[in-house]
Amino acid sequence: MKSLKKQRRIQIIALATVALVGSTALIGYAMRDGINYFRSPSQVMETPPEPTETFRIGGLVEEGTLQRGQGEAVRFSVTDGGASVPVTYVGVLPDLFEENQGMVGTGRYVNGVFEASEILAKHDETYMPKEVVDALKEQGVYREGDS
């Protein structure tokens, strides 16, 4: 009688372990495309990511680089004071988007150009992640009055 209880307990523990591992794997698989890593322009230039990798880049819109093309096409460079990365974006820019202001973009780095699929302009801490502030402070270009 004891061996049947012991065997049943082992089966339940094994089944629970398999279920836990399976659910963890499914959650990880589902989240893999939803996680966007943050990089500063210096990090992008030091170690360029794969063209298939979606990530976020943040910094200041470099002065004198904002060019509006036909339609909603826009080209500019984002800098952290140490490096600049050219950015292209097709879409409507946020109202507060301008040169020498903070921005965060989501997209891919292809052939030396960051192709943004989303641009957020900084107007408060909601749009300026701590990583961007830290990167700008590290480069010595962050202004406290900007936040």
Curated annotation (Swiss-Prot):
This protein's GO CC annotations: plasma membrane
Location of this chain's protein in the cell: Cell inner membrane
Biological process (GO), any one: cytochrome complex assembly
Membrane topology: Single-pass type II membrane protein
InterPro entries from the UniProt entry: CcmE (IPR004329), CcmE-like_sf (IPR036127), NA-bd_OB-fold (IPR012340)
Positions bound to heme: 123, 127
Annotated transmembrane regions: 10-30
Molecular-function GO term, any one: metal ion binding
Keywords: Cell inner membrane, Cell membrane, Cytochrome c-type biogenesis, Heme, Iron, Membrane, Metal-binding, Signal-anchor, Transmembrane, Transmembrane helix
Entry-linked HAMAP family: CcmE
PANTHER family with a match to the protein in the record: CYTOCHROME C-TYPE BIOGENESIS PROTEIN CCME HOMOLOG, MITOCHONDRIAL
Protein name: Cytochrome c-type biogenesis protein CcmE
Species the sequence originates in: Ruegeria sp. (strain TM1040)
